[in-house]
Regions:
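Generic structural signal for helix capping and beta-alpha/helix-loop junctions
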Residues: 16-17, 90-91, 131, 152
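Alpha/beta catalytic cores of nucleotide-metabolism and tRNA/nucleoside-modifying enzymes
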Residues: 36-39, 44-46, 57-71, 75-80, ...
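Glycine-rich tight-turn/loop motif centered on a GG-T
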Residues: 16-33, 63-64, 92-105, 165-167
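Active-site-proximal beta-alpha loop/turn segments in soluble metabolic enzymes
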Residues: 51-62, 86-98
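Non-cysteine beta-strand/loop elements that form the S-adenosyl-L-methionine
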Residues: 6-15, 75-88, 145-149
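Short, functionally important structural connectors and interaction interfaces within domains
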Residues: 3, 19-20, 96, 119, ...
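Active-site beta->alpha loop and helix N-cap motifs at the rims of alpha/beta catalytic domains
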Residues: 1-49, 55-62, 209
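Catalytic beta/alpha-barrel core
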Residues: 7-10, 26-31, 82-84, 101-102, ...
């Protein structure tokens, strides 16, 4: 009804809150249940169903476990799999720790691809620069970026040239800021101002002399002054355009 292009089942999150609900990475313990979920999700054959998973559970690598998991879920007929190429450790490590403490193993993704060449496997995990993303994209079906974009939204400004040999004239305009504030305005007062504005905070990444703007923003966030915050962001964009073209 909402006309989505794709529905993704995420069985890669290791948080305790998620585990209490019996979903997330702990579902990898029951590959048949995951397969049944994917079956049920494909009621509308016009919408692609995919899955995002880890390569295993616990501290030790186990390719047999990973392979058997993929074997089972592919029986559902899905052909798009996003893989965070780390194990998920369900106890003793925070979700943040689970994003960097378990070692990466890209070889598992390459190996399963050789078994299922007709399935699209998208690599995720540890891709902390666009240069690394470009290199890995040539070795795999594709790459998925997460924290890199959150930490530095402007990392994508040159993606068309790097990946597709196309020129672009990328710029964040005042309209972008206005549209975003219009989007979050109805939620102001009922949701955390830090949560609402966090997607914008990293537009300062790597921009010279941005410290004064950050100080003003954090001050106004403490005062919950929504309108002044919008003006600060707009002034920043107007003054710093030269640095984010």
């Amino acid at each position: 009804e909402l006309n989505y292009d794709e529905i993704n089942l995420n069985v890669g999150c290791p948080s305790k809150a998620v585990q209490k609900g019996s979903f997330g990475a702990c579902l990898m313990k029951d590959k048949t249940l995951v397969k049944n979920c994917l079956d049920a999700m494909q009621i509308n054959r016009d919408i692609e169903v995919s899955i995002k998973c880890r390569i295993g559970l616990g501290k030790n690598f186990n390719y047999e476990f990973f392979e058997e998991f993929i074997d089972e879920i592919l029986k559902s007929g899905i052909r798009l799999v996003y893989i965070h190429a780390r194990n998920a450790i369900l106890n003793g490590i925070s979700p943040k720790g689970n994003r960097n403490i378990p070692p990466l193993n890209y070889n598992f993704v390459s190996k399963i691809k050789s078994k299922y060449p007709y399935v699209t496997f998208i690599l995720n995990g540890g891709i902390n620069s666009m240069d690394k993303a470009l290199k890995l994209s040539k070795l795999h079906d594709g790459v998925m970026l997460g924290r890199l974009i959150q930490n530095n939204p402007f990392c994508l400004k040159d993606v068309d040239r790097q990946f597709y040999n196309q020129t672009n004239n990328y710029i964040i305009s005042e309209k972008t800021i206005i549209d975003y504030f219009n989007f979050i305005r109805p939620k102001f007062g009922t949701d955390s101002i830090y949560r609402l504005l966090s997607p914008l905070l990293n537009i300062f990444f790597g921009v010279p002399n941005a410290k004064e703007f950050k100080i003003d923003i954090h001050s106004m966030m403490k005062e919950n002054n929504f309108e002044i915050l919008e003006k600060i962001f707009l002034n920043f964009i107007k003054e710093k355009k030269i640095f984010i073209n």
